[in-house]
Amino acid sequence: MPASTITVFFATNRNPIGDPPTDFGPLLGPIDGTAIRFGTAEIDEKTLKLRKLEVAPEKLVFDDPTDKTLVLGSQQVFDALKAKMIDHARDTLIYVHGFGYSFTEALVRAAEFKKWLAVQMNIFVFTWPSDGKMVPLMSYPKDRADVERSGDAMARAIEIAARYLQKIATDDRCEQRLNILAHSMGNYALRYGVQGLLRRYHSTLPRLFDKVILAAADEDADTFEFDAKLKPLAQLAQQVLVYHTPRDRALIVSDLTKGNPDRLGAGGPDNTRSLNDKVSVVDVSEALSGDDDATNHQYYRVNTRVRADLRQVFGDIVPFQVKGRLYLP
């Protein structure tokens, strides 16, 4: 594709629209949301509009007994992703979006983040069936329920990626790394993805990620204290970073109006002294002016100081040496 587009790889457990699919909707897909479709999208770099969507063909059911050729969409997409990782020596970032995104909006937001972050990496989106409506008291409970039911699908998408990479011959295996960034309710999705992996691997989780970024997390503040939440995340990653601010108005609403416990993305994690050494906590309050985002919930992509911080993180600067931070041991 021309240089004027941004390639976004995706996996989704949303309901497909059309056969073959030309879009995906706000509902759980086949097999109670456990079936996953893979594909790629091209987003116009200037206008940030979807220019092209390709859903990888998938054939798991044999209508013709004489033709039992298995077609896996994941194989096609990961072949393309692997080629980019090797040819361009780029890491890959898996992005998990938050509440209120349609399928297309999730793809565009991922491309926008890659453009604004200005780090050379591949972008891969896991897009769960958020309904694309910002109606908190109506859409929020539905999205939250769908997140819980999407955990196995997310775990399967991660497992498929890991299994595929493990099959690559040693001399072909690329040295580039996988990172993950979850925003807002995407952190709740990540919790259930981690639990899905636990059911598969039991207590011995594989190291799948280099860095995991939890931004403005709509997740419980005690999440690192329980195996049933995100405590096992440290086993999956080399480094876990929590970005938070008590000034996050969206999470204040989540806390006060929806009966949720204290939010990780607002006050940060409970009991920071007992955190795994891999977990770093970054309070972004001093970087916020309110001019970029009135809710103080989208700072990971719109705030220049936070983006500069993330660029250093992806550039392998260790936490206590990141410029612009006041380090509190």
Q: Where does each model-flagged region fall?
A:
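Lipolytic serine-hydrolase domain surface
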Residues: 1-66, 85-87, 107-111, 117-122, ...
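Active-site- or binding-pocket-proximal scaffold segments within functional domains
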Residues: 66-68, 72
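Short substrate-entry loop that stabilizes the transition state in hydrolases
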Residues: 101-106
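Alpha/beta-hydrolase fold active-site loops
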Residues: 91
